[in-house]
UniProtKB/Swiss-Prot annotation:
Cellular-component GO terms for this entry: plasma membrane
Organism: Bacillus thuringiensis subsp. konkukian (strain 97-27)
Transmembrane segments: 4-24, 37-57, 67-87, 100-120
UniProt membrane topology term: Multi-pass membrane protein
Record-given protein name: Fluoride-specific ion channel FluC 1
Regulation acting on activity, per entry: Na(+) is not transported, but it plays an essential structural role and its presence is essential for fluoride channel function.
Main location: membrane
Function: Fluoride-specific ion channel. Important for reducing fluoride concentration in the cell, thus reducing its toxicity.
Compartments where found: Cell membrane
Species classification: Bacteria, Bacillati, Bacillota, Bacilli, Bacillales
Record-linked InterPro entries: FluC
Length: 137
């Protein structure tokens, strides 16, 4: 049964990568500026989702642990992209787009922490709500 985790993570990884690719294409349809908005929004969404998943879904045991691992490591891990963030930042610097690079790095780091905090806060709030209503973990 433990070999199933590799399949779950692999399938979730495929779905996360495809979701990132198509969402990126969709954002690029509407955003035609130098600032890499698609990567930023995708990474911020991933920060929120991973924090919420690990704070609420995992602690409530709403899904089997293998599925949670698949979503967190596979889907969210392939949906978000640190390497694209890094390469886009280096490209902005190479093109002397210093202010955009600084804004991008700042928004990515601060925004990622804020979105993780919001995901954690929402998950914690929902967890406490269910516990006060007499639900069990």
């Amino acid at each position: 049964m433990k070999k199933l985790i590799y399949i779950i993570v692999g399938i979730a990884g495929i779905l996360g990568a495809l979701s990132r690719y198509y969402l990126g294409l969709t954002i690029h349809e509407f955003w035609h500026h130098t600032f890499p908005l698609a990567t930023l929004l995708i990474n911020l969404a991933g920060c929120f989702l991973l924090a919420w998943l690990t704070t609420y879904i995992a602690k409530r045991n709403l899904l089997p642990s293998d599925v949670i691992t698949g979503i967190g490591t596979g889907f969210i891990g392939s949906f978000t992209t640190f390497s694209t963030f890094s390469v886009e930042t280096v490209q902005l610097i190479n093109y002397s787009e210093w202010s955009i690079a600084f804004l991008y790095v700042s928004c990515s780091i601060l925004g990622g922490l804020i979105m993780s905090g919001l995901g954690y806060t929402l998950g914690d709030f929902l967890l406490k709500k269910h516990l006060t209503e007499g639900d069990h973990l």
